[in-house]
Design a protein with these regions (language model features):
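Flexible C-terminal active-site loop/helix
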Residues: 1-15, 19-31, 42, 46, ...
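Active-site mouth loops of central-metabolism enzymes
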Residues: 17-30, 78-94, 113-123, 150-155, ...
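Conserved N-terminal beta1-alpha1 strand-loop-helix module at the mouth
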Residues: 22-79, 129
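Solvent-exposed alpha-helices and their adjacent loops that cap or buttress functional pockets
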Residues: 27-28, 73-75, 100-103, 137-138, ...
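Electropositive phosphate-/nucleotide-binding environments in soluble metabolic enzymes
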Residues: 28, 50-58, 87-90, 122-125, ...
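Catalytic domains of carbohydrate-active enzymes, especially glycoside hydrolases
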Residues: 42-45, 96-117
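Catalytic core of soluble alpha/beta enzymes
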Residues: 111, 116-271, 293-295
Length: 368
């Protein structure tokens, strides 16, 4: 059990890496992560640098669960996956989309909007509309969802979503975290319905992300009726087991998304998606396509709009008695790729210290 693993034991089988991004994403150009090997396989510890020990503790718990306890048994062998569009100009949209496979096979696209530092609200919105318009032109069959990361005020969100709904048309699936905070999100959802902002006579659907993963009470969104669905990410929620429980208790549809993980970390997201009883939306688990290179020989990059679940039994095998129930595992990192992307000594020391601090916060131990 991961609870019995002490920091010294964990760090004996841990490696730190930095993966260059093809395009800046949420301000990140080099994604740093710590890979952890345990009795059941591999896990990942990769909270963003600005996160403190308390917030990072959940990420450590998720990584230890994967490495010490495994990822569980899947209900499905492949996961539909959306493309992810950073806040790029229209001229770069096609190049980014093609990293996710053949354009006609892409089932959905998540489009970043409300990017900080790009001018006034009006200037930012104009760029967002141009980006969405180009995505719709290139992949007319794909569902479109926008993600503002809570970057708008309520009035800005009302204006922006009205304009975006007009551009996206019936392809518009939902808006993810348009405003920060649970109460504000609930008020926005109510006001959008009152104003009739929506698609084909239906209110625009709202998805909660930060209001779930950064909240002390991740179920408050559901109780307040603040969202139509939730976006769940395994690392900040503390692992697959806890994320499954949150989805079940919320009673809402869920979209499983990544936290800009390497293919090792993405495996936990795939495991969650594979274990959910229902999966009505394509998941945001194709983000390995945003890296220049990964830590595994065969990165988890979608083909034909889907990702296979690592370790899952092929369809029909278990029913025919040809295979035992599959246990999902993360792909093993390549030693040569890990060495090629290994962080310098000072950054490695910083990560090792950070793991100890997160472990202390996780276990409540008096001394590490």
């Amino acid at each position: 059990m991961w609870q019995q693993a002490d920091p010294d034991e964990i760090l004996q089988r841990a490696w730190t890496v930095g993966l260059p991004m093809r395009t800046r994403f949420r301000g990140v150009t080099l994604r740093e992560a710590m890979l952890i090997q345990g009795p059941a396989g591999w896990g990942e510890f990769a909270p963003f640098p600005e996160y403190g020990a308390e917030e990072s503790a959940a990420w450590l718990k998720a990584g230890l669960e994967a490495a010490w306890s495994g990822l569980g048994e899947p209900l499905r062998g492949e996961i539909p996956v959306n493309a992810t569009m950073p806040a790029v100009g229209p001229g770069q949209v096609e190049q980014v989309l093609r990293r996710f496979g053949e354009l006609e096979a892409i089932p959905a696209v998540k489009i970043k909007v409300a990017e900080p530092g790009v001018g006034s609200f009006e200037e930012s919105l104009a760029k967002d509309l141009a980006r969405v318009r180009e995505v719709r032109r290139l992949v007319p069959q794909a569902g479109l969802r926008v993600d503002a990361n809570g970057g708008w005020t309520q009035e800005q969100a009302l204006r922006a979503l009205d304009a975006l709904a007009e551009v996206a048309g019936e392809s518009f699936e939902y808006a993810e975290q348009p405003v920060a905070g649970v109460e504000t999100l609930a008020q926005l959802r109510e006001e959008l319905a009152r104003r009739g902002v929506g698609i084909a006579g239906n209110p625009l659907r709202i998805a909660a992300d930060e209001a779930v993963r950064k909240a002390e009470d991740p179920l408050r969104v559901a109780r307040l009726g603040a969202a139509d669905l939730i976006v769940v990410k395994v690392p900040p929620l503390g692992g697959v087991t806890k994320a499954l429980r949150i989805v079940e208790d919320s009673g809402l549809d869920a979209v499983v998304s990544s936290a800009l993980d390497t293919s090792v970390g993405l495996s936990a997201g795939l495991a969650l998606a594979a274990r959910l009883p229902k999966l009505p939306y394509a998941c945001g688990l194709g983000t390995a396509a945003l890296f220049e290179q990964d830590v595994v020989e065969q990165p988890l990059i979608p083909a034909g709009g889907v990702l296979p679940v690592p370790g899952a039994t092929r369809a029909g095998e278990a029913e025919a008695g040809q295979a035992e129930a599959a246990r999902m595992t993360a792909p093993s990192p390549s030693s040569s790729l890990v060495e090629a992307h290994r962080l310098p000594a000072d950054r490695e020391a910083w990560w090792r210290s950070r793991l100890r601090e997160a472990h202390h916060a996780l276990t409540g131990a008096a001394r590490i």
